[in-house]
Amino acid sequence: MVREKVKVSTRTLQWKCVESRRDSKRLYYGRFILSPLMKGQADTIGIAMRRALLGEIEGTCITRAKSENIPHDYSNIVGIQESVHEILMNLNEIVLRSNLYGTRNALICVQGPGYITARDIILPPSVEIIDNTQHIATLTEPIDLCIELKIERNRGYSLKMSNNFEDRSYPIDAVFMPVQNANHSIHSYGNGNEKQEILFLEIWTNGSLTPKEALHEASRNLINLFIPFLHVEEETVYLENNQHQVTLPFFPFHNRLVNLRKKKKELAFQYIFIDQLELPPRIYNCLKKSNIHTLLDLLNNSQEDLIKIEHFHIEDVKKILDILEKK
């Protein structure tokens, strides 16, 4: 087997596409590299990019169907080969491309007999179908079938909650994910202490975006998430009308500390010295320097007080709690 070779930059950080193909109208593949990276950077970028590719990119889907011909979504209609459930599943698989915001309406209005495909959907100007041949239903008799559709642009998943039988309107599970899969791998090269890394990114899309477009959009979304950290922190924040205040949760071990105080008796605490707790030397020395000599002294300090002690960490609170809960 011949091993593939790629040319990479050894000084300037660069990316390039090393493979791109279209397997079908609804399956695109792209492979990209980014180099040179220092040890550990490739994994950091790869994990972030994969999550952004799968979760941060918006897609367009049919989310609702309405028809006077449909009594309920598990029924069969005379003159139509497929069940209503099968038609809704077929609509769920239609791949759309758009730059719309909010929702739009579309329509299918066909007279049988004949096949209904994605080509028969009457779309708003801002939406296009990726594969016009996608099957929707088969009309076996000369009947009229009209289905009103709702189209939305969003990200992630939208699972149908309930059916509205009164207006013959049925929600459709939507997967707003143009990227079907994304993987990353790392290749190290170089000698000794000068080892560097190449990040390989593989992206599969449904055709509504090319892998290169998906890579650009995921990168922009990540940049937008990190931009606020580049700004100087405002000491005084004035809330606008569209903002609200939230109560911050306690630190993770606060509840355990409170429960421990309730379970133990204070009288016993004052006679238990921290020397008896078999604490790690560093934690023991930190507590001693802060005049914490007994278990009562220790539990009279809140978690916030403890982590203010010099060289004391939040992990140390966890260690102390683990030891005390075993006593």
Swiss-Prot record:
The record lists the catalysed reaction(s) as: RNA(n) + a ribonucleoside 5'-triphosphate = RNA(n+1) + diphosphate
Which sequence ranges are marked TM in the entry?
none
- What InterPro entries does the record tag this protein with? DNA-dir_RNA_pol_insert, DNA-dir_RNA_pol_RpoA/D/Rpb3, DNA-dir_RpoA, RBP11-like, RNAP_asu_C, RNApol_insert_sf
Question: Do you know which Pfam families this protein is assigned to?
Answer: RNA_pol_A_bac, RNA_pol_A_CTD, RNA_pol_L
| EC number per UniProt | 2.7.7.6
GO cellular component terms, semicolon-separated: chloroplast; DNA-directed RNA polymerase complex; mitochondrion
Could you list this entry's UniProt keywords, alphabetically sorted.
Chloroplast, DNA-directed RNA polymerase, Nucleotidyltransferase, Plastid, Transcription, Transferase
Q: Region annotation Alpha N-terminal domain (alpha-NTD): residue ranges?
A: 1-233
User: What's the domain of life for this entry?
Assistant: Eukaryota
Molecular function terms in GO for this entry? DNA binding; DNA-directed RNA polymerase activity; protein dimerization activity
- Region annotation (Alpha C-terminal domain (alpha-CTD)) ranges: 265-327
List the GO biological process terms: DNA-templated transcription
**What compartments host this protein?**
Plastid, Chloroplast
Entry text on domains? The N-terminal domain is essential for RNAP assembly and basal transcription, whereas the C-terminal domain is involved in interaction with transcriptional regulators and with upstream promoter elements.
The protein's role, per its UniProt record: DNA-dependent RNA polymerase catalyzes the transcription of DNA into RNA using the four ribonucleoside triphosphates as substrates.
Report the protein name in the record.
Answer: DNA-directed RNA polymerase subunit alpha
Source lineage? Eukaryota, Viridiplantae, Streptophyta, Embryophyta, Tracheophyta
Q: What gene name does this entry carry? A: rpoA
